[in-house]
Amino acid sequence: MEVVPAEVNSLLPEEIMDTGITLVDDDSIEAVIVSSPIPMETELEEIVNINSTGDSTATPISTEPITVYSNHTNQVAVNTTITKADSNTTVKPAFPSGLQKLGAQTPVTISANQIILNKVSQTSDLKLGNQTLKPDGQKLILTTLGKSGSPIVLALPHSQLPQAQKVTTQAQSGDAKLPPQQIKVVTIGGRPEVKPVIGVSALTPGSQLINTTTQPSVLQTQQLKTVQIAKKPRTPTSGPVITKLIFAKPINSKAVTGQTTQVSPPVIAGRVLSQSTPGTPSKTITISESGVIGSTLNSTTQTPNKIAISPLKSPNKAVKSTVQTITVGGVSTSQFKTIIPLATAPNVQQIQVPGSKFHYVRLVTATSASSSTQPVSQNPSTNTQPLQQAKPVVVNTTPVRMSVPIVSAQAVKQVVPKPINPTSQIVTTSQPQQRLIMPATPLPQIQPNLTNLPPGTVLAPAPGTGNVGYAVLPAQYVTQLQQSSYVSIASNSTFTGTSGIQTQARLPFNGIIPSESASRPRKPCNCTKSLCLKLYCDCFANGEFCNNCNCTNCYNNLEHENERQKAIKACLDRNPEAFKPKIGKGKEGESDRRHSKGCNCKRSGCLKNYCECYEAKIMCSSICKCIGCKNFEESPERKTLMHLADAAEVRVQQQTAAKTKLSSQISDLLTRPTPALNSGGGKLPFTFVTKEVAEATCNCLLAQAEQADKKGKSKAAAERMILEEFGRCLMSVINSAGKAKSDPCAMNC
């Protein structure tokens, strides 16, 4: 695809703006098929004579009707006339005096590269005008669709009019032979009573208006080619439509027959020319001899595409109340492959392993009476669990028990093995089918490591086979064990398991029972005489029951609900807002909290917890009725008390942190391993403090005391001498420990 020349796109807005013709939405234009020559009418400011100095010959042209369908409301009939003109022929414009001056119609501003198509009211003797069309590709752009009576403008690009600027200066003598020239004539209908229009005109700066038309005498041997473009009804939401007609010209100058037309490189079939007018859809039609090559409608309104999404296959939910029965010999292999070794009708032996959450089942044959079976395990493992005396296993977790039927049999034997007692208890039930109970986990995780268990406790194969077949099934939850109930493996009343739940004691976490993990929002009350049914009980005032409080003879609990309800009713009768929060936000614009009713303190100065404002750590407001209040911002007493309160709170926090740190250190000391008694092979110093060393040290201390007594030392001096002697003895012990590696120490006092 080649790009449309930029000069065509740059000319479109000017041509559209220069026409000055608006579109009417309700115009109903009919298609007019022209099969005979039709006279043409020209609009001229003055009468101009047309004379041609050169003889021109018109070649026969064959045309054929073509019907094109599009989405516009207007219908356009295009008549194409093909002629071949020599590029060297120069035609001088001259107007015969027989033309009549027409009445002035709607004035139209026309640029130098536009062609006007006008209606013809009567026949006139018009010859070929001064426009010589080059055979290198013409582009006639229909810039508007007007009403009946208004001129139709077809614009030619400026590059297509090289000879229009120099027309009336040169004249050549001799016969001028006109090869077939391709001239596109557009006939456009307005309303139903409009007359068809034929003609293409080019405007030059040196002439007013020159129309090229066909006369009956000239076009007797020509056939007009009619292109009928049928339109669909206009939609009410569509805006003005500008139609662009792009006519293709042959690339070379060869004679063109009536049936063949080549598209020149500047004009691409189906190429949509850009349009500068926003919001106006454009209709581009490329017309050639073979018909409409491309027709494209561009509109700014885009409809979102709806993409149909194919529904995904939802997973099938198969809820089965009864277990499936897999019949031997008729197993369908549509989803799973089942390998079942069956020499004879096997029975199922149930195995209970203490401490295991999986239920194991052993397959044994009915004919084998001996308990010596061949152990099968593909992965040798030494992690075995010896069986103890059989007892009901209490399941704390919630494993999934998968029931898979293997084959139907007349009787099902469930055996609970007891290694201590060789005899096993056999329970015969009346179930019509066997069930293999296994957890719904992948196969490598559920293979039991029971290699070294006694006979009768492993998965035994059928005679003649070396493997045990597992039924590969999807993990459907058939039976799920809950903590609230325990289902016994045996299905008969002969073997009954204890239905119980091993409950773990709720251990307090950080000294708080889990049910009471929610921290208390306020401190406990200390009521003694009010029965906790007065508003000065914090628990009662906040609508809560007393819990772990220090109150005595408390009625604020569920046991005394009647008295509690009576007290609540009495408080509400006195004050309907008694149980509402006393500390709330201030008025509009006040961000500080304040008491909703105000305090009534008289002797405390509002600096004790009796004052509700001070207790809430807010200052008294103007609604308080207190006397001698010191709970205001600039009060020195309040600042001192607040500082003391803050200091006390900080002290409590520090004590709590110290207790927590001390407890953590003690726990670390308890859990810290005991240090080794030997260091590097030598003895530690305290190992030298034996009974003999202690006796010698005491003798040394007594000797120092006697010496101080003889010298008459004071009591303080005597104690000092004794302590110095004790220190010397300890240093001797330590030094002896340091020399223990080299030579044995000798204690000297």
Swiss-Prot record:
Key words, A-Z: Acetylation, Activator, Cell cycle, DNA-binding, Isopeptide bond, Metal-binding, Nucleus, Phosphoprotein, Repressor, Transcription, Transcription regulation, Ubl conjugation, Zinc
Disordered: annotated segments: 369-388
Span list, region Linker: 583-596
Gene Ontology CC terms: nucleoplasm; nucleus; RNA polymerase II transcription repressor complex
Domain CRC: 521-634
UniProt-reported outcome of changing C525Y: Abolishes DNA-binding to the CDK1 promoter
Domain commentary: The CRC domain mediates DNA-binding. It contains two CXC subdomains (joined by a flexible linker) which are both required for efficient association with target DNA. Each CXC subdomain coordinates three Zn(2+) ions.
Protein name stated in the entry: Protein lin-54 homolog
Species, as recorded: Homo sapiens (Human)
